[in-house]
């Protein structure tokens, strides 16, 4: 018998559901992908497969029609099922569940399927829809997907969480002259009526953020990575770069693959190894299984490439190859542990180079690659731990940054040193075997490693992984009769409560004609170094001489006169880094003094990586920590010293680094005229090799200075032949205009998302827009730039918020700029804490400049 009262009650509950978005089952519907939702879905859903079809028209403005068949098993069927789809409901056209067409319910970024349409066991969902495009990166004649961390849901309905791995079938319908690449091998392609249908075999088991395809007008190179055939798609047209790079690109991949197979004792775990070079790619690379994507400019280098550029390419390829095991084969359970895949990729990429370059070069490269970048965040009041909490994947992009990419490998190096290399390797191998094709967390790994370690890793883990910051190290050295009678080393936290960072480091005592190195186990707030007692008093002491210790180390002023006599390149690099870090903290040395010290070494430093480090520091000190008045007074002398050092140095790459430094800092008319002649005649100084990209950079630098008309930029544009590079140049040009109104209009245009699509180009343009020589007119953009940050985080890719802030605030030093940041943070006391931290990280040099310039 029908109970009218129950019907009425049911209607009321249904009405409440519609207007509140709350599930009567107790499962709340909220934007993003909450951790609660992810945990529930993982507990009931398994054996997921997606069969997807995208019909991609030749015209970018035309919509992409898509079809999806999704199959999965349910172990329980008591709640409304939520599929993630961050698009308008109007783009969902037809929904069929287990053979039955049902009404479409969609709100708060979720497609909802009521339990009555589902069943325990196997289920099938078919959807006809218009594809979302937020993560499709559509261009005029190519596109590529980029779904990390939670952007698959912007393109098609799915379970967009890393621990619901799935297999994927894919069909792409594209223009006949396009090529396509995906995770699975290409089964076949059929041409008909000017269109091409590409069908791909079922992929390996992947998380949604690793599902990918690339399609468009690309060239294709077939080569081998190890024993496998490998297809490489690219759009580069510069034959010098292609001829100089192609064989090396495949070789670096093959070498990296062999190293990781040997080190992990696990053969390459997937069916194919293809990759694509993308113009103006947002990241360095992305580890999509079977279809890795790279930034084209990092892969393709000509004969003018510096050691830093060559290292960056090798590192990048090794990094993405390492991800095949660390991230793809074993994936983090939740993005709280996204750092795990990145730390292993970076750390293992570094290790893969050690055998070929030798320990000394490896140690130096590791130091200069990771420590300055890690300190750049960890010294700030906005620093974050390596491992962070995350309640919703919509905020997962804020987890990325230099802490996980650079401090985490340093932590891992200390962990390997603590355990020993063999035991560390044994533990990691067990971890990979145990969680193959599955998901794992940091506690899963640390519990395994703990079995192989003598030390208490749980306690060690607490300060290194779960807390932010770095130690500040100081010392006292007591002397008696020319001997060291007592040597005490102290450590304390730079910010926050008292903490101890257990670590090993080396300290070297330098004497006339010789030196003595001491290894220190710094595992307490105060360590008495018994080994030093009775030694002769040295000329000077260098802390962290091997470059493996992490913290703010003392700088012995007695070292200054002997700095360039230190024989080991890694020790000199460590000294340079410590000097710079201490300068920022107002210890031992002032900015102008340090600038002079570094400039004096430009003709003496013999190691290219060190010269690159020094020139970076010179540029930063010059623009950020000297007043405009002091810069103007110093400019002619500085220019002459840099140019003279360039003439003294004999190696082409050393000369090029110094030429680029000269280009960065020049202010005088004489220097401008000299550079203009180099650019106009396209004749580099003797011994310096410049590429088209270098002349483009030179044109940008000259356009910033007064007295250069717009014909310079137009002529440089006419020299560029590659279509993608031309578009990049045209995008950046307004940011360099001498007309303030045109620059205002450019900044205003960035308020529209469509004008921010090429994020790497936006970052380059913002750098020039906010260059110190333009800050008197660009400071007015700062309030709006901060106001836009939340939208930037919501609409952009993972690195864009940091890039937006860094290229905007990176060179400001004025009280006005500092006040804008302070006022913004005061005005928004409940601001997203992770974004607030990024503001503090980026503005740290600004606030330090205010203190140091007083």
Locate the predicted segments by residue:
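Bacterial Sec-dependent N-terminal signal peptides
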Residues: 1-29
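Hydrophobic alpha-helical and helix-loop surface patches within well-folded domains
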Residues: 3-7, 25-26, 40, 200, ...
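N-terminal, polar/Ser/Thr-rich
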Residues: 24-66, 77, 93, 137-141, ...
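Glycine/proline-rich low-complexity spacer/linker segments in large multi-domain proteins
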Residues: 35-42, 119-120, 128-172, 216-221, ...
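Hydrophobic helix-coil surface modules that form long, contiguous segments used
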Residues: 66, 159-318, 347-350, 359, ...
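Solvent-exposed beta-hairpin/edge-strand motifs
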Residues: 78-101, 504, 508-513
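A surface-exposed beta-strand-loop module
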Residues: 86-143, 193, 526-536
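Non-catalytic accessory/interaction domains
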Residues: 171-174, 179, 189, 196, ...
